[in-house]
């Protein structure tokens, strides 16, 4: 049954002819046998398809799309690959498989959660997909795609995840393309902001004993610092400590 997936990949990359009707019937007749293949093997074959040199041409072949979506129903949003500009194409083809799959599986439903459940992927990649999913949902509710919120992502996560978020929305949000490309360029050489306040500083300056209250106070200071464009005065720190 792996031959079905390998045929799809071969046809996508090399064939210049149409699928024969007889072969279509054979594949459709045997498609249920795919369930006998392990999820690890299926994921490996899917990676090969996604990293194929002609991957972005996939939607031009209705039969390929039909069979791939029967095998991988989570790929219901393959139409996202239609009408991409050169910037969007470059982002997709230059990124790794898990970024590519995130672009396809994330929507308003639990589709991406089901993909994570079905396939055995690392916790790092699970968290990566979940971050993109959560940010996508938040952005649907209200426009949170601002420079300040991107700074927060950089501070709370890392540069790689920030790039994921920006790249994801460049591909998915054609209406804001110029703004998103500017954000990408702006953050290219930026480092995460640093809060120059720690537990030792608070205990020594305000004569506070070590304990849970120090941690709670630090969290309040950090929140104020983040909400205020990553700035906080000595007066505000004192106010929070003594509140």
Language-model segments: what does each one mean?
Residues 5-12, 47, 63, 218-222:
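Short, amphipathic alpha-helical segments that act as regulatory/interfacial helices
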Residues 26, 42-45, 49, 220, ...:
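Solvent-exposed, amphipathic alpha-helical segments
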Residues 1-4, 21-22, 37-41, 50-53, ...:
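Short acidic alpha-helix initiation/capping motifs at coil-to-helix transition points
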Residues 18-22, 69-73, 123-129, 208-217:
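Short, surface-exposed acidic
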Residues 31-174:
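Conserved, hydrophobic alpha-helical core segments of structured domains
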Residues 4-7, 61-62, 133, 202:
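A residue-level signal for conserved active-site and pocket-lining positions in enzyme catalytic cores
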Residues 1-34:
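Internal alpha/beta core interface subdomains
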Residues 11, 170-243:
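Charged substrate- and nucleic-acid-binding regions of tRNA-handling and nucleotidyl-transfer enzymes
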């Amino acid at each position: 049954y792996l031959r079905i997936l390998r045929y799809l990949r071969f046809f996508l990359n090399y064939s210049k002819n149409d699928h024969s009707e007889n072969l279509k019937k054979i594949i459709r007749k045997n498609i249920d046998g795919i369930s006998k293949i392990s999820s690890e093997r299926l994921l490996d074959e899917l990676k090969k398809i996604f990293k194929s040199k002609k991957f972005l041409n996939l939607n031009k072949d209705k039969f390929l799309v039909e069979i791939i979506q029967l095998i991988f129903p989570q790929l219901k949003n393959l139409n996202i690959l239609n009408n991409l500009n050169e910037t969007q194409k470059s982002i997709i083809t230059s990124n790794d498989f898990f970024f590519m799959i995130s672009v396809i599986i994330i929507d308003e439903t639990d589709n991406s959660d089901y993909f994570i459940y079905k396939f055995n992927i690392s916790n790092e990649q699970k968290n990566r997909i979940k971050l993109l999913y959560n940010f996508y949902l938040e952005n649907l509710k209200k426009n949170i795609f601002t420079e300040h919120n991107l700074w927060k992502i950089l501070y709370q996560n890392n540069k790689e995840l920030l790039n994921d978020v920006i790249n994801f929305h460049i591909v998915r949000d054609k209406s804001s393309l110029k703004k998103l490309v500017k954000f990408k360029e702006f953050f290219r050489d930026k480092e995460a902001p640093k809060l120059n306040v720690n537990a030792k500083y608070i205990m020594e300056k305000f004569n506070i004993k070590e304990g849970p209250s120090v941690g709670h106070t630090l969290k309040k200071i950090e929140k104020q610092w983040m909400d205020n464009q990553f700035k906080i005065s000595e007066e505000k720190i004192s106010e929070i400590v003594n509140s």
